[in-house]
């Protein structure tokens, strides 16, 4: 006959086995939960790494533009990129990007001339990477100082609206638009004088006309925000842009400015002046 002590041992063993059987599904479920959390964390880390690469790309672009290093600017754009800078019209593809920067903006010159200043401070970036990690949006602003020693100086500022794409594992610009906010001579400042946007180049015409006509200062234009309000989630609409933008106040209208016209008009006085 089995003793009470032995019965107790058998009972404990059975209880342990039963507990183990019950615990197996729970442990499996727990493992799946951990794996899911790890996968979500890995995705968040990957998106933050993408964001860092995008921000470095955009800042590097600004530094290359400063010194007119066009050979380093062009590779930053995707093969099907679309670029539009300051009312010059739309340039498409690698050839168009090279034409706009090296021939239109750079006027077929590489690097800065002696005594030339060309600062483009790319600031205040707001970037959002798509959940799939393949595309992203960005909104930045450029504060610009242009000058030729003892000849002229120019202030300018404007908004970059940018789309990015991951091409062959590298983030690049797929769409870039820069909307000029103001252009003004250094000696007078924005309180007394303002110039309108540049027009299209006759020598190196764009692939398509300017996508949107808008007012520079003393008028104002609000490019559509590519992101929703970070608190309310409300998306920006074209109706919002229309509501907050002026019409007919561009400095190209002589009635709006004592220094009406394009900032390129300064080039006739100072041929070496670098256009923006």
Where are the language model's segments positioned?
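Bacterial N-terminal signal peptides that target proteins for export
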Residues: 2-15
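C-terminal segment of classical bacterial N-terminal signal peptides
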Residues: 19-26
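Terminal "cap-and-tail" regions of soluble proteins that handle hydrophobic small molecules
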Residues: 29-52, 170-276
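Short, aromatic-enriched amphipathic alpha-helices that serve as compact interaction elements
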Residues: 50-66
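A solvent-exposed, acidic/Ser-Thr-rich amphipathic alpha-helical stretch
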Residues: 70-142
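Hydrophobic/aromatic beta-strand elements that line small-molecule binding cavities or substrate pockets
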Residues: 123-127, 159-165
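Beta-strand elements of well-folded, non-transmembrane domains
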Residues: 142-146, 164-166, 180
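Short, cysteine-centered beta-strand-loop-beta hairpins and adjacent loop/turn segments enriched
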Residues: 144-154, 182-183
């Amino acid at each position: 006959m089995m003793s009470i002590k032995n019965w107790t041992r058998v009972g404990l063993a059975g209880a342990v086995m039963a507990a183990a059987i019950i615990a197996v599904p729970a442990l499996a479920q727990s493992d799946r939960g951990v794996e899911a959390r790890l996968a979500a964390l890995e995705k968040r880390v990957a998106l933050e790494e993408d964001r860092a690469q995008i921000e470095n790309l955009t800042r590097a672009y600004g530094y290359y533009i400063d010194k007119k290093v066009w050979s380093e600017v062009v590779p930053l754009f995707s093969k099907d990129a679309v670029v539009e800078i300051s009312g010059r019209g739309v340039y498409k593809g690698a050839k168009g990007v090279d034409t706009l920067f090296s021939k239109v903006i750079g006027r077929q010159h590489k690097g800065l001339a002696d005594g030339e200043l060309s600062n483009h401070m790319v600031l205040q970036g707001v970037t959002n990477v798509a959940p799939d990690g393949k595309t992203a949006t960005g909104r930045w602003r450029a504060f610009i100082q242009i000058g030729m020693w003892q000849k002229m100086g120019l202030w300018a500022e404007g908004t970059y609206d940018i789309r990015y794409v991951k091409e062959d594992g590298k983030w690049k610009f797929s769409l870039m638009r820069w909307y000029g906010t103001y252009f003004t001579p250094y000696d007078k400042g924005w309180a007394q004088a303002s110039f309108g946007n540049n027009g299209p180049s006759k020598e190196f015409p764009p692939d398509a006309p300017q996508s949107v006509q808008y007012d520079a200062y003393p008028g104002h234009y609000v490019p559509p925000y590519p992101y929703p309000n970070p608190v309310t989630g409300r998306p920006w609409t074209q109706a919002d842009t229309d509501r907050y933008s002026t019409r007919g106040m561009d400095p190209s209208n002589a009635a709006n400015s004592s220094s009406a016209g394009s900032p390129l008009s300064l080039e006739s006085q100072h041929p070496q002046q670098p256009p923006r």
